[in-house]
From Swiss-Prot:
It is an enzyme of class 1 (oxidoreductase). This is 1-deoxy-D-xylulose 5-phosphate reductoisomerase. Belongs to the DXR family. Mn(2+) binds at D133, E135, E203. Pathway: Isoprenoid biosynthesis; isopentenyl diphosphate biosynthesis via DXP pathway; isopentenyl diphosphate from 1-deoxy-D-xylulose 5-phosphate: step 1/6. It catalyses: 2-C-methyl-D-erythritol 4-phosphate + NADP(+) = 1-deoxy-D-xylulose 5-phosphate + NADPH + H(+). NADPH binds at T7, G8, S9, I10, G31, K32, N33, N113, E115, G187. Its EC number is 1.1.1.267. GO terms for biological process: isopentenyl diphosphate biosynthetic process, methylerythritol 4-phosphate pathway involved in terpenoid biosynthetic process. 1-deoxy-D-xylulose 5-phosphate binds at K114, S134, E135, S158, H181, S194, N199, K200, E203.
Length: 368
């Protein structure tokens, strides 16, 4: 298999599962963590390696592997790979072209890069995609019973770092505080996306493209992250998916469903140790971006705008140029502005063009 983004949280877990399942690693890619990819090269001996920045070439120790550089280099590497499976764990819209290239080459795509579906779900062949995500894995597991007819799909949210912060203090929070996730250990972008509820907006759009544009889709807060998904059926019964908060479960099924079903990759749940599972609505007062959920489901192509404005605001937030309120404000302004416009988005180029336009427009907007 090919692992793109091998030095991140998902990538490291994927390599752990691949080793356990005896899956050969044909190719690896990383962003800036050259020290770690050098270690991974020693262990997994890939035939091909891609890095983002040519200035890192001097520090790379490829041990005979063919080396590719930049996003175009990743595309070229995928083109040459013979593996049937590509796991795309690149962060941000940077992973979009790699998803397209993998599907063009008729490869199965294990997709951890949320931005691919969020920005271009209408252009991707969903039949070749397995989402690497605890919520969508939960929905997939619940929908295996074909006798029951689903009516609504519900995913859970932890509430993120500011779920108990006094409302009047949320806007002034900094990145350091946003990175204190109560349940999961993840990369910085997804942890902040969890605090802003952007991550759940992403997952709502992913659910729309993956499981059905005709079903009701919603989310709720379940603080323990033990409940990942719920499906309500036409008979008004609801089935719930519970599992430990561990990404190795969805990753293992994306790599090899048969082996995953026979080998436990996560700790069993101790049902007696569970606190009372409690569901809470997502408060629009606390998570102001949640008010755009219905707008995004009505016009899912706005996902490009959501993602581009979020990435621009995220960079400023991490660089301490704006506080949390500024991040929220940037995304709100972008969605309000583009909700009034119409756009086709019938090709990858058109998606990337709109992405660029949104970035340029909001790059220089002063935040709170």
């Amino acid at each position: 298999m090919v692992v793109l983004g091998s030095t991140g949280s998902i990538g490291k877990n994927a390599l752990k599962i691949a080793k356990k399942f005896g899956v050969e690693i044909e190719a690896l890619s990383c962003g800036k963590n050259i020290a770690l990819i050098n270690e991974q090269i020693k262990v997994f001996k890939p035939k091909k390696v891609a890095i983002l920045d040519p200035s890192d070439l001097n520090n790379l120790e490829p041990l005979g592997a063919e080396v590719f550089v930049g996003l175009d280099g990743i595309d070229a590497m995928i083109e040459e790979c013979v593996s049937n499976l590509v796991l795309n764990a690149i962060v941000g819209v940077a992973g979009l072209k790699a998803s397209f290239k993998s599907l063009q080459r008729n490869k199965k795509l294990a997709l951890a890069n949320k931005e691919s579906l969020v920005s271009a779900g209408n252009l991707l062949d969903i039949s070749q995609i397995t989402p690497v995500d605890s919520e969508h894995f939960g929905l997939w597991a619940l929908l295996q019973n074909k006798t029951l007819k689903p009516k609504s799909l519900i995913i859970s949210a932890s509430g993120g770092a500011f779920r108990d912060t006094p409302l009047e203090l949320i806007a002034i929070q900094n990145a350091q505080n946003a990175l204190k996730h109560p349940n999961w250990s993840m990369g910085s972008k997804i942890t902040i996306d969890s605090a802003s509820m952007v991550n759940k907006l992403f997952e709502i759009l992913e659910t729309y493209w993956l499981f059905g544009t005709s079903l009701k889709i919603d989310a709720l807060i379940e603080r323990s992250s033990i409940v990942h998904a719920l499906v309500e059926f036409e008979d008004n019964s609801i089935i719930v998916h519970l599992a430990s908060a561990d990404m190795q479960l969805p990753i293992s099924y994306a790599i090899d469903p048969k082996l995953a079903s026979l080998n436990a990759s996560i700790k069993p749940l101790d049902l007696y140790a569970l606190n009372a599972i409690k569901f809470e609505p997502i408060s629009m007062e606390r998570y102001t971006l949640w008010r755009y959920k219905d707008l995004l489901l009505e016009n899912p192509k706005l996902g490009v705008v959501l993602n581009a404005s979020n990435e621009v605001a995220m960079e400023k937030f991490l660089n301490q140029e704006i506080a949390f309120g500024g991040l929220i404000q940037t995304i709100s302004q972008a969605l309000e502005l583009y909700a009034k416009k119409s756009f086709k988005l019938s090709s990858l180029d058109e998606v990337l063009e709109l992405d660029k336009e949104v970035r340029e427009r909001f790059e220089n907007v002063a935040g709170v």
